[in-house]
Amino acid sequence: RGLGDVYKRQEHPEAEMWFGTHSGDPALLATDNDRTLRDVVAADPTHELGSATAHTFADNLPFLLKLLAAEEPLSLQAHPSLAQAQEGYARENAQGVPLDAPDRNYHDPNHKPELIVGLTRFHALAGFREPQRTLELFDALNVPQLQPYVEMLRAEPDATGIRAVMTTLITLTADQLRECITATQEAAQRLVAANGEWVDESVTFLGLVSEYGNDAGALCALLLNRITLEPGEAIFMKSGMLHAYLHGVGVEIMANSDNVLRGGLTSKHIDVPELMHVVQFDALLDPIAPAENVVLSSHGIVPA
């Protein structure tokens, strides 16, 4: 209810509030709720955007700002590069897939790099953990059902190994998933009780299973950095970076796109082959950008 609390609208939970011109949900003008920011920009893009921006971005506002409030974990997802988005958008248009179809992947021809800044403490999964550290986590869990996949990563402790393990985990059969997740639950509970190094990762895994059941995304989450942003800290999600927001309120700036490829932890459309096509499997070693000291001025929030 984070956004409802901020804007005093608490009739129902609100996960996102968009400020932009994207056709999926253009912002309404405070002075005229029948007119959108998209309408204003379209009427005179050179005046509203400036000639250089209007020329470079085909008369479109190039970014989308969101307030995001995650009470429960959001989907495991990644976003395409510009070339991938353009190709995917053209392909689905040629196939006659309606823009509002629930199984459509590409709603526009734009990429979607994004940066999120925590307004509260903000928990997320972001990018692949360094493979050696992931091996240490799996060794601590010591789940026999996962050992074949652990050995795959041990044999190739790099992006190739991460790709192989994730490809295997995300395509397990329902019976295999149930067996692996049940065994990993028991191991994670043991690590939580021991209150050792991998408590946060174990608690997160258990929470995902509680929320989504035998979902492959819960196992894939064990490959990712589990991070916590303090207020003012940020993380940049480049194209192809696998991530999932877990809990907290943040402000997010991104390219003007709504292209999302999902791989789990959701009831929405999942397209595993397309997700694996766009995901980058290199480890993310230093994900968090520290907060800068800021002060309030007549121009808003500026560096101190």
Regions found by a protein language model. Give the residues of each.
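Conserved metal-binding segment of the jelly-roll/cupin
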Residues: 76-77, 228-247
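Short, structured patches in soluble enzyme cores that scaffold and shape functional sites
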Residues: 78-80, 111-121, 130, 142, ...
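Conserved AWS/pre-SET-to-SET junction and N-terminal core of the SET lysine methyltransferase domain
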Residues: 203-231
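Long, charge-rich alpha-helical interaction segments
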Residues: 135-211
